[in-house]
Amino acid sequence: MKKNTFWISSAPRTGSMWLFNVTREILKISGSDVLPKKIPQWDEEMLELYEKQAMYDQNELNKYVLKLHTILNPDLPRSKILSTIRDPRDICISFLEFMKTDFQTALKSTKSIIKYSNTYNEYDKDYLKIIKYENIENKSIETVLEIAKFINCEIDYNLAKQISEKFNKDNVKKIINKNNNNL
C-alpha cells in the first residue's frame, strides 16, 4: 500500500514549520492534492484526522502532511516521518527569544530533543528521515532535494531552488508581516 501521510514530528523550535511548508510545496508541485486544506492547530486534531480520514483515503492523489510535537510509533500504516534536529543551545535561545519564556521553561522544552533523538535514531531509515536544522539554513536546496527523494517526488535543482527561496527566513518574515498588517 502506498504512503499517503507524511508526518512532521519534531521538538519545537527545530525547523519543523519550514519542513512542513516545504513538504507540502513539493507534493503540490508534484501534482498531489495536499491535505488538510485547513490546518489543525493541535496534535490531537492531527492524530484524529489521520485516524478518521487519511488512513482510509484510497485516492492516490491525496497526500496528507501532518505536523505535531509528539513522538510517533515506528509502524504507522501508510506513513513516513520527517523530523528535525537542532543544537540544544540554539533551541533554548530560540525559546527565550521568540517564545518569550523564562529560562526554566526554555530548558525543559529543549530537553525534549533528547527524547526525539534517542527514539527516532532506532527507527528504520526508509520510514523516518531526520533533517538537521543547520542544513535548512546552509544547504537548503540540497535539503529540499533530500526531502523530495524521501517522499518519492522527483523535482529538479531549479524547482528545489525556487522552493528554497520561497521559504527562506526573509521571505517568510515578509509574508508574516504582510499578514499581520492585513489583520
For the regions a language model picked out, list residue spans one by one:
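PAPS-dependent sulfotransferase catalytic core
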Residues: 1-65
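PAPS-dependent sulfotransferase catalytic domain
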Residues: 29-32, 60-165, 169-183
